[in-house]
Amino acid sequence: MMSIQRAAQINRQFDYMSIKELWMAKFPLHKPGDCLDMFKNGDYTGPTMGCIQKTKASKKNTIFHIKSDFNSTEYDEPPISGFKMFTQHCCQRIDEHFCGALHPVISNIEFEHNQLKTRPQVASELNLFIPCGIKNLKIESGEKSTWIVGTKFRKCMCLKPVIVAATIIGTPINKNLITFCSSDYIQVIVNRNREGSCGICMGNVSTYEACGNWTNETWGEEFSLDLKLCYKCTPVAFIFSLMMSTGHKPYVSKKQFEENRRKWERVLNYKICKENLDSHLACANHENVYKSIKKYEFFDSVWVYHLANSSWVRDLTRECIESNPGPNYIQLLNEHSQRYGFVQPTYEIIAVVSDGHHSYQCTCYYKDMKTQSTGPSKKNAKHQAAEQMFRHQCF
């Protein structure tokens, strides 16, 4: 099967990949696509799978079937009816590119095996969707709170900054962080328990309803595919084609999409978010996930955007990828301790949120003194603390 062969590299390495790598594998690296799990109880050699391979979406190399550790019945099951699902492809690229797909957020948290029991497009309790224009989020679960602080950003297709990498401060969360464009996204309502059996996993067939981000809204009217499939085994391209064939169209037309592309290529600056993103958070996320979001902050400064990206790159200096300008006070302080026989300085670095921005606080201990400094990156904070100590002790 072509869609299985396309994912051959991932499937060969499946047993040696970490949970984080398996999640990232659901987002194609080279171009947007749709990665579907191959369940242990699924029939991937039968006529239904053959029909999928003959479609335009498959021939365009946008459908991938990757191995899974689960049976279809072990998947996270949203409510019987009424849960939402994106009809967009997924993309793993983190560089500047014009793209309307869903993107994963790189973070410092460890993944749990349970987080793989969902599709990136589904509004599940395991997924947290973050629209463009947001730089920080605060999540509360009981008495525990967590800050999701963006540390690297790229230009979204609507020119607003969108999170690429984030630092999790506080209680770790078992959520898959996914970003989307708040100006152009399409969802459907999925009804998962309908008559008929899925031709792949033998689960119940799913039907779909249009959401408010389609033209020609038909609230409550269910549409079904000719091919008997559940939402877990259905490529999103099939759902999109189904809605288009029943008279629905996205609010952003193909002509407008191309105009946005030309504008994106022409405009170098970033647009500051001035709209209320609360409705987008509510539409995209599961109800319980949305209720846990207690605070979020807009990106209100282009200068901060550039500073965050530059500090993210500056951390590469420790790998000798980028030179560090100016005196190296860390080295000078070490030389001073060796020259006079003192114990070498020690450093403590912690992540903090200062004025709504992600920062690092470094404390330098040398002899009987300590200095403290805060900076946008670990290296920056450490250099500043070492500089303060060097100037105090050596002059």
Curated annotation (Swiss-Prot):
Q: Cite the DRBM domain residue spans from the record.
A: 328-395
Q: Which CDD domains match?
A: DSRM_SF (cd00048)
Q: Which GO terms describe its molecular function?
A: RNA binding
Positions marked as site (Cleavage): G326, P327
Keywords of the record, alphabetical order, are: RNA-binding
Keyword RNA-binding present in the record's keywords: the answer is yes
Name it: Non-structural protein 1
Q: Which organism is it from?
A: Rotavirus X (strain RVX/Human/China/NADRV-J19/1997/GXP[X])
